[in-house]
Amino acid sequence: MKTLRWFCAAALAVAVGVPSVRAQEPPKPGPEHEQLKKLEGTWEATMKYMGQESKGTMTYKMEVGGLWLTSNYEGDFAGAKFYGKGFDSYDAGKKKFVSVWVDSMITTPMFMEGTYDKEKHTLTMTGEGPSPAGPTKFKSVTHFVDDNNIQMDMYMGDAKDPGFTITYMRKK
C-alpha cells in the first residue's frame, strides 16, 4: 500500500510539473515533393544491360501525406520475372533527395541520396548497395527529358560508363 501511495504521488508530481505536451506539427510537402509528384502514373520501362534488353512497367504514387513517392516495378530480367519497390523523398534536414530500393534479386536494401539540378533537369544520387562482388558504390543519373520521358543511367564502382540504362515512357 505504501508503494502504491508513493507511485501515485510521484505520478501526480510529474503530471503537474510537466508542461502540457502538444503533438508536433507534421511536415508538409515542399517544392521538392511536388517535383516527385510529377512522376505519378504508370511508365513503360526498357532496360539495357550488358547487351541485353528487357521490358517492364513502373508505377509511381505519392503516399504518406504527400511526402514519399513509392514505386513498383514489374518486368523481366535475363529471362526471369523481376520485381522492385522504391521509396523516394526529400530530406529537408539534409537538403537532399533520398531513396531506398529493394528488389527480387537482393536481400539488402540500396540507400542513395543526392541533389537535383534544375537547369539540367537531372537528379544525381550516390550510395552503396549489394552486388555479386559484395557492397558496391553506386551512382544514378536520372535525366528528366520531358514530362513523359526519363532516362536513368546507373554506374557501379568507379566505372565511367553506365552498368545499365533504363528509359521510361509515360503510358497514355
Report residues per predicted region.
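Hydrophobic small-molecule pocket/channel-lining residues, especially in calycin-type beta-barrels
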Residues: 24-172
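Bacterial N-terminal signal peptides
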Residues: 8-17
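Bacterial N-terminal signal peptides that target proteins for export
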Residues: 1-8
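Sec/Tat signal peptide C-region and signal peptidase I cleavage site
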Residues: 18-23
